[in-house]
Swiss-Prot record:
It comes from the Bacteria. This is dTDP-glucose 4,6-dehydratase. It is an enzyme of class 4 (lyase). Homodimer. NAD(+) binds at residues 17-18, 38-41, 64-65, 86-90, 105, 165-169, 195. Substrate binds at residues 90, 139, 194, 204-205, 220-222, 229, 264, 298-302.
Amino acid sequence: MQTEGKKNILVTGGAGFIGSAVVRHIIQNTRDSVVNLDKLTYAGNLESLTDIADNPRYAFEQVDICDRAELDRVFAQYRPDAVMHLAAESHVDRAIGSAGEFIRTNIVGTFDLLEAARAYWQQMPSEKREAFRFHHISTDEVYGDLHGTDDLFTETTPYAPSSPYSASKAAADHLVRAWQRTYRLPSIVSNCSNNYGPRQFPEKLIPLMILNALSGKPLPVYGDGAQIRDWLFVEDHARALYQVVTEGVVGETYNIGGHNEKTNLEVVKTICALLEELAPEKPAGVARYEDLITFVQDRPGHDARYAVDAAKIRRDLGWLPLETFESGLRKTVQWYLDNKTRRQNA
């Protein structure tokens, strides 16, 4: 399925929120081919890929990254030039109650994928072996908490994960770097800030608030809502990830952020203001969307602030986000308003 001179990229977790954006970007904006490997858990949705599903440069394999035999089959069958590893359990709240799933997928699954990639890479012709890339996509949560400082996370910030989720991703990051250092597997790591955009599973803050507001349900905000996050539009992130896997330097780490620091309460209030404009006909009994905001008990171990310094990827690879938080959030709200069936399924 590979076009002459173009890459064949294996994307794990390609039916997820960020993964599907990456797959769409590659198929719609490059001449590369994609093999989408996804287990299709609750958060995976092939509807996100209907626009490109019939493209001859796209293939889908329903495979668990913990299934080594199936991984070996996929590598042998499709012979990828690069791996973009996004398959992961990613919701912090779920990790608090079901940490074992996160250990299995995020740590053991990454190990199995690394070993399958290494076995495949070692038997490649020398010129192909040198060009091969293993790009591991991670989170800024591995760095811990910036509470009480004006600092930003850089690529050299020490790891200090606070939750079972971030600890599992930190472990995966360390495995990838160890395989690069020990076995010379050509690897790159990127760490991103909070993603948002159309098609996101509604357990995450922004889609949950949009969908609850449109249904007249409470808008639950942890604690006092003062926690700060940096927000990155998912399509900007997809462009960055493609640049990293095609242009990034082996052994390097790239932080990817939107320079959009907002408190959680600011985000929810901005969503409410957009809905007042774009969906003025409210559910019965709702005078203002903001009236639905409800403060709830804070999450255990809730980090106060994340903020990413994306200067390195801007300087070295020339990447810049195209969306402001305001423009990206408007597109996101409008998508949920325009996709009522998706809202009902969510």
